[in-house]
Amino acid sequence: MATLAAPPPPLGESGNSNSVSRITREGKKITYKLNIMQQPKRARACGQGSKSHTDRRPVDPPPVIELNIFESDPHDDSNKTDITFVYNANFFLFATLEPERPIATGKLMTNQGSPVLTGVPVAGVAYLDKPNRAGYFIFPDLSVRNEGSYRFSFHLFEQIKDPKDATEGTQPMPSPVPGKLSSPQEFLEFRLEVISNPFIVYSAKKFPGLTTSTPISRMIAEQGCRVRIRRDVRMRRRGDKRTEDYDYDNERGYNNRRPDQYAGSDAYANAPERPRSTSISTNMDPYSYPSRRPSAVEYGQPIAQPYQRPMASTPAPSSTPIPAPIPMPGPVALPPSTPSPASAHAPAPPSVPLAAPPPLHTPSYQSHLSFGATQTQYPAPQLSHIPQQTTTPTHPYSPRSSISHSRNQSISEYEPSMGYPGSQTRLSAERPSYGQPSQTTSLPPLRHSLEPSVNSRSKTPSNMITSLPPIQSLSELPSTTSQPSSAIGSSPANEPGPRLWETNSMLSKRTYEESFGHDDRPLYNGMRPDSESYPGGMQRRPSYERSSLLDGPDQMAYKRANGRMVSKPATMR
């Protein structure tokens, strides 16, 4: 039978360790010593109910109890031998839960409630070398159902294997009879009890959280024992949120949602935080571009045009003189084949209008309608600042321009035009009104004024519109071909020749326009069939020259796709 050991020591600090001694049949003294190396500190209540048995909330940290066994002479306790590893017996430790303060039992309190302690309350001994060479009892799965303040009470039980290790004065165990079934004759003897420090069981809302695993738990786990290890702090801060290390994101989100009057005096920096309006009229950009083109009166002073304006290409070798302003003290640098300034300003016959000089700060323009031909740039002369006068156009704008195929903004649209005597008559020939017939673009009186205007198109403004000269009949065509022009220099385009097309000398394959007629060419960038500007450095002769050349033996020769050369009379359209 199990014998009762000495009563447990009083509670307090001395309750963390306890020891007891007994005398064996051989007259030896054996001492048992229990020491709680790791005390429980906190736990979360796992609650009551049908699922409470699966809700494991172990006590943190897990309790660890150390067992040491010593053997000595009954009359001399100074010479003790540690026999923990060589003692032949079985030990286990049983844990019970007790309240911190004992509750007096009433007369009518006969029925105890449901058990508060859950989990595995029994632990076997594990012989380890660290932290000390001893036996250890580990309780990694102890849970408490209700919140409160409790203590653990650990009871040590021993199962003796050798009869000589039995306690002195007890009856010897009967020897088992072979081949006869009988009840087991082994007994468990209670040795001693040790009580832990009080710990608190919290509810789910008040639980502060779990801490990292202690060095003792890590050391025991490294030796193969079942202990749950946590490498980070799992603390829950639900109570007073006073520090900024764990709710920084919440405060930052609150600051971003604050109204503008709490932010600061800088209204431009906090503008994106204001609520947006659903009205389209209130979302207009104050610095956006105007929806209409301002007139010349709104702009006032002339402004230089910062970008290049694409214009229709003209024959590369031919160029026309541009009259220089009268206040210029010296000659102006002009392209090749330019006559002297005196001849440029000489009066011309009434049928030949003068070209207006370019305005101030006119940049060079580059043609974008070359269609594969070499693009040319003509530098504009730098003129001095001259007082200018505003000229109001007298006729509506005609979109069917005989010079350019796409209307582009020029500098003169933002500047007042310069008051030169021949500027109004030049633009009248350049832009016919809507009431004029379409065949007026190829009349002979306009040929001499159109050719210089094509070359000077990239240097002169195009917003001044005046009246057109009178239209001459077709019967006067032969007489007008021999009229001289004093304001136009010699140009390859003005020399008579038997060819229908005027082309530059190129050592490459002929283009599409060289083999096909005027109406067969593709139209790009707003080009019109009645336009007289042709890409690729080619310009078609007027209709009166074609009619005169048709009487001759001129034929058009072209190469077919199979490589055979074919010639036929030129087709007039």
Swiss-Prot record:
Stated family: Belongs to the velvet family. VeA subfamily.
Protein name: Developmental and secondary metabolism regulator veA
Phosphoserine sites (modified residues): S183
Residues of the Velvet domain: 27-230
Disrupted-gene phenotype: Aboshes light-dependent conidiation, allowing conidiation to occur in the dark. Impairs formation of sexual structures, even under conditions where sexual development preferentially occurs. Alters the expression of the transcription factors nsdD, steA and brlA, the penicillin biosynthetic genes ipnA and acvA, as well as of the sterigmatocystin-specific regulatory gene aflR.
Natural source organism: Emericella nidulans (strain FGSC A4 / ATCC 38163 / CBS 112.46 / NRRL 194 / M139) (Aspergillus nidulans)
Biased composition range(s): Pro residues: 1-11, 318-339, 347-361
Ranges where the record places region Disordered: 1-24, 39-63, 236-295, 307-367, 384-573
Amino acid composition bias (Low complexity), ranges on this chain: 387-412
